[in-house]
UniProtKB/Swiss-Prot annotation:
Superkingdom field: Bacteria
NCBIfam families cross-referenced by the UniProt entry: tatAE
Membrane topology, record value: Single-pass membrane protein
Subunit structure, as described in the record: Forms a complex with TatC.
Record protein name field: Sec-independent protein translocase protein TatA 1
Keywords on record: Cell inner membrane, Cell membrane, Membrane, Protein transport, Translocation, Transmembrane, Transmembrane helix, Transport
Function: Part of the twin-arginine translocation (Tat) system that transports large folded proteins containing a characteristic twin-arginine motif in their signal peptide across membranes. TatA could form the protein-conducting channel of the Tat system.
Protein family membership: Belongs to the TatA/E family.
GO CC terms: TAT protein transport complex
One example GO MF annotation: protein transmembrane transporter activity
């Protein structure tokens, strides 16, 4: 698999800008970042560990 060329990245960013608009772009980026963060947490099992700690403290 090869990396996209710089002009391809610019084209993709322009298409995203046209679709979402400049005002919505920060919200889209924030949502994407949160989604990736939650996905990584789910893969590492961090949520399960937090739940176990809360149960232990509540007992």
């Amino acid at each position: 698999m090869h990396f996209p060329l710089p002009w391809q990245l610019i084209l993709i960013l322009l298409v995203i800008l046209v679709i979402f608009g400049a005002s919505k772009l920060p919200e889209v980026g924030k949502g994407l970042g949160e989604g990736i963060r939650n996905f990584k947490k789910a893969l590492s099992g961090e949520e399960e560990e937090k739940g176990k700690e809360v149960k232990k403290e509540g007992e």
